Curated annotation (Swiss-Prot):
Classification via SUPFAM superfamilies: YebC-like (SSF75625)
UniProt record similarity statement: Belongs to the TACO1 family.
Name of the protein: Probable transcriptional regulatory protein CHU_3516
Record key words, sorted: Cytoplasm, DNA-binding, Transcription, Transcription regulation
Taxonomy, superkingdom: Bacteria
Pfam family membership, one: TACO1_YebC_N
One CC-aspect GO term: cytosol
Subcellular location field: Cytoplasm
Source organism: Cytophaga hutchinsonii (strain ATCC 33406 / DSM 1761 / CIP 103989 / NBRC 15051 / NCIMB 9469 / D465)
GO molecular function, one term: DNA binding
HAMAP family associated with the record: Transcrip_reg_TACO1 (MF_00693)
Coiled coil, from the record: none
């Protein structure tokens, strides 16, 4: 699963890099985390994870600090986290995670992207069953034995551990994500990246031309400032 996850994430990252949106999205996550649990990274686990993820893509420290500071400002917007579900071309299921300060605007935009592509926005909960929400934690695997680590971490929610080069991927149920991060911290294991992923239960294979059509739609979503992440059940190819 580690390789498949990296492939999906890699394609998503390339699109975000092209749009120069990565820092904006990470900054918004930092703001939301700080608003929710305060600006102290030592006592706010969500903020700690958001900052760590920002550092993993070389987000400058001054931008990270500025995002934390913005959270306490009176003029900073409150963001609502919303998930939209719909079908794109060729019956591809798509989930769009958003953080918005104007839900009416976001609904209209997301619906238009689906409609213009020949797809349709669905009702809340209509497609979520096609995906399984997981915690995915990437750690530095130097000096670690994946099999021994799995035995040690199974009581903390480890469902699968996959080694890929010098890195190890730890998969957990969504409800065990925070518990696992806390345990890794206590063991002084270096976390490179940690996030939740909506992994499709099954995937649909398309032709190269059809895939490109889907990728264009994904880019439309990801180009929207309200969109934080997009997941789909199209089979990814190298």
């Amino acid at each position: 699963m580690g390789r498949a996850y990296e492939l999906r994430k890699g394609r998503r990252a390339k699109r975000f890099d092209r749009m120069a949106k990565a820092f904006t999205r990470l900054g918004k996550e930092i703001v939301m985390a700080a608003k929710q649990g305060g600006g102290n990274i030592e006592t706010n686990s969500r903020l700690r994870t958001a900052v760590n993820n920002a550092k993993s893509v070389n987000m400058p420290k001054d931008r990270i600090d500025a995002a934390i500071k913005r959270a306490s400002g009176k003029d900073e917007s409150d963001y609502e986290e919303v998930v939209f579900e719909g079908y794109g071309p060729y019956g591809i299921a798509i989930l769009v995670e958003c953080a918005t300060d104007n839900n009416t605007r976001t609904v209209a935009n997301v619906r238009s992207y689906f409609t213009r592509s020949g797809g349709a926005l669905g009702k809340t909960g209509s497609l979520e069953f096609l995906f399984e929400r997981k915690g995915v934690i990437k750690i530095d695997g130097t000096g670690l034995d994946p099999e021994e680590l799995e035995l040690e971490l199974i009581d903390f929610g480890a469902e699968e551990i996959v080694k890929d080069g010098n890195e190890i991927f730890i998969y957990t149920a969504f409800v065990d994500f925070g518990t696992m991060l806390k345990e890794l911290e206590q063991r002084n294991i270096t976390v490179i990246n940690a996030e939740t992923e909506r992994i499709p239960n099954t995937t649909t294979t398309l032709t190269t031309e059809q895939q490109e059509e889907i990728y264009k739609l994904l880019e439309k979503f990801e180009d929207d400032d309200d969109v934080q992440a997009v997941f789909h059940n199209m089979a990814e190819t190298e």
